[in-house]
Structure formats: structure tokens, C-alpha cells
Amino acid sequence: NTTGKPEYELNLEISRRLYQELQTRGYEVVMTREDNETAISNKERAELAVREKADIFLRIHANSSENPDIQGAMTMVPSEENPYVGELSAESSRLGQCIIDSYCETTGMLNKGVQYYDDMTGINWSQIPVTIIEMGFMSNAEDDTNMADLEYQSLMVQGIADGIDDYFGNVRE
């Protein structure tokens, strides 16, 4: 990546800001980690979401590629054929679509859409609608520079929060 910011730092920065934004909008939010020292497995994260009676499970990530020209954002969800959580595919897809469309519309990030993955433990342990947002490619100079910029991060957070509003049918002011 060009900015030198590690993915785990970016993910936590955005997650913290999103936490504040969603609380401001009236959502109850549970974070699976609030620092970079917390070690928590994907299974434990999914179990926490169930224990807290969460309605959705959103995982915040940034992408990387061997090819520095690849850029854009996407969401990842289970397919209907997923042997573990196929029954979550339709609602997870709707969640992923709401979030990625709003995120890309707000940030101007290239929209790579909803992608189906059945080999991600971050998805396969879930018991509620789940999506992973890959916010951009840290291996792409433009995406990485944008994602490290505080003003751009505000757009990222707004886009994700607006997508969650869209999913729940909440009208924005």
C-alpha cells in the first residue's frame, strides 16, 4: 500500500467512526473489537453477534491485489449453495447490495458489486444476514490514498450507514 497504513488500523478507524454514526442514527451497535490487541476468532465474532441478538453482521475490511491497477469496492456474501449458511444468502445479498450501492454512490469508489463466497469463515460462522465490505484496494494508489484521507473516510462512513438505513427501510433526512 502507498500510505503505509496497515489494514487493521484502517478497518478499526472506519469501524469506530461508523459505530458513532450508527449510534447517532439510533442503532444499537456491538463492536467485535475496539482495539488492535484484541484477539477474537471469526467463530467468536459470529457467536457474539448471536448472543447480542444482532439483526445484521457487518464485517469491515480493505482489499489487496498483486495487480496495483485493480481498484474498487465490493461486498461479499454467501451463495444459496453455501453448505453452511445458504439460507442466509437472499437477505445477506440484499444487505450487501444496499451497502455497496450507497457506499459507492457516496464515495465515488468503483462499484464491483456483490460477490458470492462460500469459503470465508467470516461468513460461514454467521447465523444472521452477513456481509463483508471490502472498502477499496490498499494495493491501488488512488484507493489507498482516498481511504487514508479523513474527509474521504467521512464519506465512507456515511455511505455504509446510509446503506444500512436502506436495508432497514429507514428514511434519511
Show where each model-derived region lies:
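Short, surface-exposed beta-strand segments enriched in small/polar/acidic residues
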Residues: 1-2
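Active-site-proximal helix/loop segments of hydrolytic enzymes
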Residues: 5-173
